[in-house]
Amino acid sequence: MIGRLTGTLAEKSPPQLLVDVGGVGYEVDVPMSTFYNLPVLGERVTLLTHFVVREDAQLLYGFLTATERATFRQLLKISGVGARTALSILSGLSVADLAQAVSAQEAGRLVKVPGIGKKTAERLLLELKGKLGPDLALPGAVIRNEAQSDIVQALIALGYNEREAAAAIKPLPADVGVSDGIKLALRALGK
């Protein structure tokens, strides 16, 4: 399974990217929320991924935040919602908006997403109720490079949850190294 890609952003054409990792180009489908926050072509990018193996294809879906990927995976568990539909939902609504719509049972917000009809919207509300917790309703930290991704993973390994880890890396400089970043993040978490 491929859980994360770090490489050079070689091409981007909504909703697909080509990420060059060590001379191998990976095609990755992303929601528009991720697409709009990507660096310019030629820059390094780190994407958290979800790998789908089908009879006729192997597909990678990429996200800048762990929150978005977790929501995507939660959507895939719903009967009748495939990867394309889940991607469409996350392109039409932010994670916070989706969580709010589910909490308020607002089918009207979901119906505005292309490909989501009234019945599908009602099924989404029913099956997601109580499953998009408060952590998913909060915007996650955008992981801009491999060091920040490693810092988040280290904090999670030390027992912090994704929300705490994401909050701890937000104030860190983009060019901070892994060991210094972990120290700074731990200091911030200790306050």
UniProtKB/Swiss-Prot annotation:
Identify the main location: cytoplasm
Domain of life (superkingdom): Bacteria
Q: Where is this region: Flexible linker?
A: 138-142
What the entry lists under SUPFAM superfamilies is as follows: DNA helicase RuvA subunit, C-terminal domain, Nucleic acid-binding proteins, RuvA domain 2-like
**Which GO terms of type biological process are on file?**
DNA recombination; DNA repair
Positions of region (Domain III):
143-191
Which Gene Ontology MF annotations are present? ATP binding; four-way junction DNA binding; four-way junction helicase activity
Q: Where is this region: Domain II?
A: 65-138
Give the start-end ranges of region Domain I: 1-64
Q: Into which family does the record put it?
A: Belongs to the RuvA family.
What's written under domain?
Answer: Has three domains with a flexible linker between the domains II and III and assumes an 'L' shape. Domain III is highly mobile and contacts RuvB.
What's the protein here called?
Holliday junction branch migration complex subunit RuvA
Organism of this sequence:
Leptothrix cholodnii (strain ATCC 51168 / LMG 8142 / SP-6) (Leptothrix discophora (strain SP-6))
Upper lineage: Bacteria, Pseudomonadati, Pseudomonadota, Betaproteobacteria, Burkholderiales
- Its gene name is ruvA
